[in-house]
Design a protein with these regions (language model features):
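Segments of small-molecule ligand-sensing domains
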Residues: 295-398
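Extracellular/periplasmic Venus flytrap/periplasmic-binding protein
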Residues: 183-231
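An alpha-beta-alpha
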Residues: 57, 147-202, 302-330
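Gram-positive cell-envelope targeting signals
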Residues: 1-31
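Flexible loop/hinge segments that line or gate small-molecule binding clefts
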Residues: 115-139, 263-270
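Extracytoplasmic "Venus flytrap"
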Residues: 36-56, 60, 64, 71-82, ...
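Hydrophobic alpha-helical segments within soluble ligand-binding/sensing domains
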Residues: 139-169, 278-298
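Periplasmic-binding protein-like
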Residues: 39-40, 92-101, 118-122, 229-240, ...
Length: 398
């Protein structure tokens, strides 16, 4: 009987040691695992848009050290992304981040071709469209929140200019340099105007499209044209510093101010820059890389609002951030107002796309939307979907 007990104990110990040994072997294998992460950029560090993504890549490098090797392709024009993505696959990338909206169709196609590689499309909107691929994902921060806060800052400056007699309420006009008449751009400038009108209800806006994401001369020329039309605060959804330089160099009779995007323009426009907003891409990218390292599904690891293969978040998860406030130029009390507005957005106490406005689809004037009922931006997609021009308060410059 004792012999049976001894054999049983020996057998049990042997099994335990075997299990522990296997666990340690595989755990150590995963702990020592290294992967490659690829990044495809439409520009380089000279443009605010790409520089912002590069900050997120640097955050990945800092977070993972030798465990993750990052590889980047710069100045990849929309339409030329196939070769760059194929090169990243050939170089052994386990996860690839494509960072310009125009890349999405080719990126999804290549995801189907390379099922062992994870493809993450920033600003994309096609992850949940057929065919849905397990290795193709879209993500974006709810930047309309940041645009709204930027608009509040602009509104406070307009109010200050009205109160000190620099302009009248009728002159409370914003200008906006937009790249394309896409939902992403329209949603952004609408939120910006609505933020301003929460402070100055008489504020209106004029929009000038460049029809390119990044062209310094076109963006500067657009901003100059808006200033000539009487706009006193200029903002942008474009990639260069052209609007900032236009504001700083203007000799208009009325002072002109700037609200930026993606990158502070305080050095280029120290006397006109107010504030800016940006998407913080680092949380998604770091968590997606962690998911690949841990061999887990990205949507099970990234913290945000998950909708199928798509994830988004706003101020609540630090996916949207305000850039530095130029307190020398901003109206008194702006810093406190920013903090209060962000808190209200986090708590759902502000519904941005709501009010006594009628929006008109620029591609189909019979398609209108009454904002009295509110528009739930990002309800089903991290990419913006609001695509209506507000009647009577927004003009599109021809």
């Amino acid at each position: 009987m004792k012999r049976i007990y001894v054999i049983t104990i020996i057998t049990a110990c042997t099994m335990i040691f075997a299990v522990v040994g296997l666990y340690n072997m595989f755990w150590k294998k995963d702990a020592d695992r290294t992967i490659k992460a690829g990044f495809v950029y439409v520009g380089d560090a000279s443009t605010a848009y790409t520089s912002n993504f590069m900050d997120a890549q640097e955050a990945v490098d800092n977070a993972f050290g030798d465990q993750v090797h990052t590889i980047a392709k710069y100045n990849v024009a929309e339409g030329a992304e196939r070769q760059s993505i194929e090169e990243l696959v050939a170089e052994g990338c386990d996860i690839i981040f494509a960072t310009s909206y125009g890349y999405e169709n080719v990126t999804k196609e290549l995801a189907g071709k390379y099922p062992d590689v994870q493809f993450c499309m920033a600003t994309g909107d096609n992850a949940n469209a057929d065919p849905v691929l397990d290795n193709y994902h879209t993500f974006m921060g709810a930047i309309y929140e940041g645009r709204y806060v930027s608009g509040v800052v602009a509104g406070m400056k307009l109010q200050e200019l009205i109160e000190n007699g620099t302009i009248t309420k009728e002159q409370a006009r914003l200008g906006y340099v937009g790249a394309y008449p896409y939902a992403e751009v329209i949603s952004g400038y609408t939120a910006f105007l609505l933020g301003a009108r929460s402070i100055v209800p008489e504020a209106t806006m004029e929009v000038c499209y460049t029809n390119t994401w990044s062209n310094y001369l076109k963006e500067k020329k657009c901003a100059q044209a808006l200033i000539e039309d009487g706009c006193v605060i200029i903002s942008q959804h474009s990639d260069t510093s052209g609007p900032a330089v236009a504001c700083e160099q203007t000799d208009a009779d009325i002072p002109v101010y700037l609200v930026g995007y993606n990158q502070s323009m305080s050095e280029l426009a120290p006397t006109t820059y107010l504030i800016g907003a940006k998407i913080n891409w680092a949380p998604y990218m770091q968590q997606a890389v962690q998911a690949v390292l841990d061999r887990k599904k990205i949507e099970d690891v990234v913290v945000g609002k998950v909708n199928g293969q798509d994830i988004g978040a706003g101020f609540d998860e630090n996916w949207v951030q305000m850039l530095e406030l130029n307190e020398v130029v901003a109206a008194e009390g702006t810093k406190e107002k920013i903090a209060a507005t962000i808190e209200q957005l986090k708590n759902g106490r502000i519904e941005v796309f709501q009010g006594t406005y009628i929006g008109v689809n620029p591609q189909d004037e019979s398609d209108t939307y009454d904002l009295k009922k509110g528009y739930p931006e990002n309800a089903k997609s991290s990419a913006p979907t609001f695509y209506y021009i507000l009647q009577d308060v927004i003009d599109i410059k021809e």
